[in-house]
Swiss-Prot record:
Protein name as annotated: Actin, cytoplasmic
Organism: Planorbella trivolvis (Marsh rams-horn)
Modified residues (N6-methyllysine): K85
Modification(s) after translation: Oxidation of Met-45 and Met-48 by MICALs (MICAL1, MICAL2 or MICAL3) to form methionine sulfoxide promotes actin filament depolymerization. MICAL1 and MICAL2 produce the (R)-S-oxide form. The (R)-S-oxide form is reverted by MSRB1 and MSRB2, which promotes actin repolymerization.
Major subcellular location class: cytoplasm
PROSITE patterns in alphabetical order: ACTINS_1, ACTINS_2, ACTINS_ACT_LIKE
Amino acid sequence: MCDEDVAALVVDNGSGMCKAGFAGDDAPRAVFPSIVGRPRHQGVMVGMGQKDSYVGDEAQSKRGILTLKYPIEHGIVTNWDDMEKIWHHTFYNELRVAPEEHPVLLTEAPLNPKANREKMTQIMFETFNTPAMYVAIQAVLSLYASGRTTGIVIDSGDGVTHTVPIYEGYALPHAIMRLDLAGRDLTDYLMKILTERGYSFTTTAEREIVRDIKEKLCYVALDFEQEMQTASTSSSLEKSYELPDGQVITIGNERFRCPEAMYQPSFLGMESAGIHETTYNSIMKCDVDIRKDLYANTVLSGGSTMFPGIADRMQKEITALAPPTMKIKIIAPPERKYSVWIGGSILASLSTFQQMWISKQEYDESGPSIVHRKCF
C-alpha cells in the first residue's frame, strides 16, 4: 500500500459533472458530464457496432439519438446501474487505469443516506476490486483545499446547494442546510426568461446553449433593484451572444436576474430562503462559541459560485444579518469549481491519511458497514 508509484485515484461525482484524476495532481485529469445515454431507436445498420449505452461527452455529442439520464440527482446517487457505468467509464476510458491496482477516494454529498455509502463501498470492492477506498464529504474537502479545517462552506453545484459548518475537520450534521436550487435550476430559469424576450429554447440540446450563455454572461448584482433601474434606462448592461447557427441574440437584465434566484428563490416559485439566509441559519444552529470562526471563514465552492460579483453580494447580505461588530470574510478561491476534487487530491496524498483507507481485508471482515466506522 505504501508504494509511491501507486497513486490514489480521486473521483468527485457531482450531479452535473464528474471530476477524476490522481492524488497529488493540482487539477483533475478528466472532467465530463455525469450522464448515461441509451439509444431511443433500434439500430438498423447491422455490424455498425452500436453500443447499448454511452457515457459523458460521447453521450452529450450523440444526444440527438439518445435518451439522457443523470444517475445523480440533487447530489445523491439514485440509479446504481448507471452510476456503475460512469465509474467504469472513469477508470477505463478517462483515466485508463486498472481500479484493482489503486486506492480510490470517492466524494459524497453532506447527509448522504447510510445505505448509499454502503452501496458505494460495496461496488468499489466487489465490482471494481479496489485494494482500498475511502468516502469523504464534499464540503469538507473544499475547506481543506482552502487551507482551513474550520469554517462554513457554501457548496453549490449543478444539482444541489449545501451550507456546511465544519469545526476542526468535522462537518456538524445538525447545522447542515440543503437547498434544492442550483445550476440546473438557474439554467432552466434563464431558458424561461429568454423565452419572454422572444427567443425559444426548449430541447435538451438548446439547454446546453443556455448553460453556456449563463456561464459566459451572467453575474450577481450587488444591489438588484438598482441594477434593474440601470438596465431599464440604459443599454450599458446589454451583451450579445452568437448562437451555433450564427444568429446573434442580445441579453440585458437577464444577465443578473438569472443568478438573483439564488438570493430570491421566489423567482423560481420556491418558498425556501436564499443562500445568504441559509448560510446564516446554519451558523445560528452552531454552538455560540464557534460562530465567530465560521463568519470569518466562509468559503465558496462549486460551479454555481463562479458568477462574478457573488462574493461581494454574499459579504453584503451576511453583514446585514450578522451581529454589527462581527468580522465577516468570504473566501472565493479562483479554482473553486474544482475545489472538492483538489481537497480530495490533497487528503489522499497526505502521509497521515494512509492509515485511514478502508482496505479490502477490512471490508472482507466487516462488510459494507465498515464505511461508517472509518469515514466520518
